[in-house]
From Swiss-Prot:
One Gene Ontology cellular component: cytoplasm
Binding site for tRNA: Y15, Y65, N67, N113
SUPFAM superfamilies (alphabetical): Peptidyl-tRNA hydrolase-like
Top-level taxon of the source organism: Bacteria
Protein name, per record: Peptidyl-tRNA hydrolase
Biological role: Hydrolyzes ribosome-free peptidyl-tRNAs (with 1 or more amino acids incorporated), which drop off the ribosome during protein synthesis, or as a result of ribosome stalling. Catalyzes the release of premature peptidyl moieties from peptidyl-tRNA molecules trapped in stalled 50S ribosomal subunits, and thus maintains levels of free tRNAs and 50S ribosomes.
InterPro entries: Pept_tRNA_hydro, Pept_tRNA_hydro_CS, Pept_tRNA_hydro_sf
Subcellular location: Cytoplasm
Organism: Caldicellulosiruptor bescii (strain ATCC BAA-1888 / DSM 6725 / KCTC 15123 / Z-1320)
Site feature (Discriminates between blocked and unblocked aminoacyl-tRNA) residues: N10
């Protein structure tokens, strides 16, 4: 494998379309985008793989629940001997309005427990991540992130996921800097 792309979320039908599962939704979209399925059980998660632009990619949805995501990811990283810069993590972020997408090469956990778990397990903050804005909580944080998107927000989230997926495509075709320029800017593919 050349890359691992993982999306963070919680397993179970009741969480499928919740704000905290933006990462899982992105992985599902990527699976369709690259014509694969994420349905094999491995690394305490569900996996699928594809090859694009000469690169082999593993898609991973940790089934450990959000706060223990690192346990699943470290197993895959160690198995494939992937360097942290070849691990791309997609997750929800309350710091951005619904539908805003941002990519960066590294950073702190920003208060996100899934990212905190990954940093603990990897022993580094130096892995790329794509953050999908889910909006600032209007009420209790836990209830908010575990609530479903409102009707007017769903289209914004799916446009954000589409933009993130196009960014992944650019990354695989070229490099992370071009992907970041696309995702963080107003560039249209």
């Amino acid at each position: 494998m050349d890359y691992i792309i993982t999306g963070l979320g919680n397993p179970g039908e009741r969480y499928t379309f919740t704000r905290h599962n933006a990462g899982f939704l992105a992985i599902d979209y990527l699976a369709q985008f690259f014509n694969t399925k994420v349905d094999k059980i491995k690394f305490k998660g569900l996996v699928g793989s594809f090859e694009y632009a000469g690169k082999k990619v593993l898609l991973l949805k940790p089934m450990t629940y959000m706060n223990a995501s690192g346990e699943s990811i470290i197993e895959a990283v160690n198995f494939y001997k992937i360097k942290p810069e070849k691990l791309i993590v997609i997750y929800d972020d309350i710091a951005f309005d619904v539908g805003v997408v941002k990519m960066r090469k590294k950073g702190s956990d920003g208060g996100h427990n899934g990212i905190k778990s990954i940093i603990q397990c990897l022993g580094t903050e130096e892995f790329p991540r794509i953050r999908i804005g889910i909006g600032v909580p209007k009420y209790d944080m836990v209830k908010y992130v575990l609530s479903e998107f409102e009707d007017g927000e769903k289209e914004k989230i799916f446009r954000a996921i589409e933009k993130a997926s196009n960014g992944i495509k650019i990354l695989l075709e070229s490099d992370i800097d071009r992907a970041m320029n696309y995702i963080n800017g107003d560039v249209v593919v």
